[in-house]
Amino acid sequence: MTQQAQITPLTVRRKFADPTLWHQTGQEVRLGCTTCPELRWCGGLSIQAPVFNCMDFCCGKPETCTRYICPSQRRYSTLVNEVGGFDLHPYRHRVTPVLALPDYVPCILDAGDLGGPLSLPAVAVSLYSVIDHRTGVAKYSSRQEMLKRFKIHPDARVILTATAKDRRVENFWHVLQPKKTAESLRKLRPSLITTPNFSMHADTVRHDNLVSMARIAFCFEGFAAAGLPVALHVNSRTPNDFARWTEYLIASPEINAIAYEMGTIGRSAPRRAWHAQQLVALTRNVRRHLTLVIRAGWSHLAELSSAFERVIMLDTTAHMKAKKRQSATRIGRRLTWKPAHTAAGETIDELLLHNVRVCRRATRELLSAQRASDLTIAAHKQHEVTTSTAVN
C-alpha cells in the first residue's frame, strides 16, 4: 500500500466473549476448514461451537455490512490488498532499541484534574490522544508541547500505547499516512511506541483476523523504518496465530520487544492463563531476549517475567482510581481501594502519585519474588552439575 492509497474504515461494535468460540486443545478442526484456500494462514477452527467453517459467522448481508472484513463483501479484495495480502513479511532492517524503562509505568488517561508537572520517571499516554483523528499526524509539533498538554515532567520518558477500543483503533487505520504519521511521532521522541492492537474477534470470519495481523505488521514496519523504538503487538486468537508471530519474529531478528493486552480477553481465568502460556511458548521458541510490554494480566506477571528478558507493566488503574477519588492500600498482598475525598477544584496529583507508589510496589514484589525463585532454581541446577562432576 502506498502513502496515498485510500484506506477503508470499519465500523466495529462491542461484542461479548463466547467460550464455545475459543480454541480448545484436542478439538478437531472444523470439516469445512480443510478445503479452505486460506487454511495455510488460518490453521483452521478448533472450537466447540457447531459450525462448518468460519463463514457461518457471516451476517448474510454483504451489501450493508461494514463490521468486519468478509469475503462476501464487495470491498473484500480492496481491504486485503491494502496490506498486501495475508503474509507477514519479515522486517530485516535495524530496529531502534528500547530505552531503559522501569518495570512499572502508569498510564495517564487525560490531563483533567491534574496540576502537574507530574514527578514520575516514566508515563504512558494513548497514541490516539496525540494523533489528529482527521489528518493522521501528531497534534503536537514538539515533545515539549505534548508534555505540557499531559502535565508530564520534562525529564520523564514517554511510552505511546496503541491499545484502545475498536473504533479508535480502526479510525487510526483510516487516517494513517504511513510515512507522515511515523515522522510526526518521531518529533515527540517517545521512549517506546506499541503498534495498534487491531482486534482478533472470535465471532467473525477468520479473514478479518488475518487482515488485523497484517495491519499490525504493516504499522510496525512504518514505525520501525522511521527510527521509532517500537514493540510489536502480537494479537492472536488461535495457536496458529501465535505460531505465525513466532515465525515472523524468528525471521525478523532485529525486533527486540513485543506487546500484549490482557484486559480485553474477558474475565475467564483459564482463557487468560492460556494466553499467558502462549506468550511464554512464543519467547522460548524465538530463542532470543525479548522485552514484553503488557497491559493487565497482573496474575500472570510472575510467570511471564520468568520467560522474558524484561517485562514492563503499563497500568491504567492508578489514574483511573484517582479520577474516581479512590486511594490504593495494601492488605497483605491484596490491593484494595478506599474513598479519598478532595476539595472542590483540588487537583488529584498527590492521590495519583500515591496510587502509583502502591501499585508500583505491588508490581515489583511480584517480579522480585519470581526473580528470587529463578535464582534459587538456577543455583540448585548449578549445585547438581557441580556435585555430578565431582563424583565423576
Per-range role (PLM):
Residues 13-14, 30, 40, 67, ...:
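Arginine residue identity/basic-tract feature
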